[in-house]
Amino acid sequence: MARITVEDCLNQVPNRFKLTLAATYRARELAQGHAPRIDSKDKPTVTALREIAGGHTGLEMLRKVPT
């Protein structure tokens, strides 16, 4: 079972609203077939949170989104 907490992610991204956006965009990328940056057999949402908690991805996800 996947155990990841918001507190683990907030160490990397202190604003929980930006954390939600970054995790959403990364999970969407993973669901579309992008390669995960960590070894994980979890669903895209959990994998995205694990990547953020591990420092493998973060707020740069927000800079990739066209405005």
From Swiss-Prot:
Alphabetized UniProt keyword annotations = DNA-directed RNA polymerase, Nucleotidyltransferase, Transcription, Transferase
**Per the record, GO CC terms?**
DNA-directed RNA polymerase complex
Q: Which GO terms describe its biological process?
A: DNA-templated transcription
Q: Which InterPro entries match?
A: DNA-dir_RNA_pol_omega (IPR003716), Pol_omega/Rpo6/RPB6 (IPR006110), RPB6/omega-like_sf (IPR036161)
Catalysed reactions listed for this entry: RNA(n) + a ribonucleoside 5'-triphosphate = RNA(n+1) + diphosphate
* GO molecular function annotation: DNA binding; DNA-directed RNA polymerase activity
> Which EC number applies?
2.7.7.6
**Which Pfam families does its entry note?**
RNA_pol_Rpb6
Q: Please indicate if the UniProt record lists Membrane as a keyword.
A: no
Q: Its quaternary structure? A: The RNAP catalytic core consists of 2 alpha, 1 beta, 1 beta' and 1 omega subunit. When a sigma factor is associated with the core the holoenzyme is formed, which can initiate transcription.
Q: What does this protein do?
A: Promotes RNA polymerase assembly. Latches the N- and C-terminal regions of the beta' subunit thereby facilitating its interaction with the beta and alpha subunits.
Family stated for the protein in its record: Belongs to the RNA polymerase subunit omega family.
Which NCBIfam families does the protein's record reference?
rpoZ
This chain's protein is named DNA-directed RNA polymerase subunit omega
| Protein species of origin | Bordetella petrii (strain ATCC BAA-461 / DSM 12804 / CCUG 43448)
High-level lineage: Bacteria, Pseudomonadati, Pseudomonadota, Betaproteobacteria, Burkholderiales
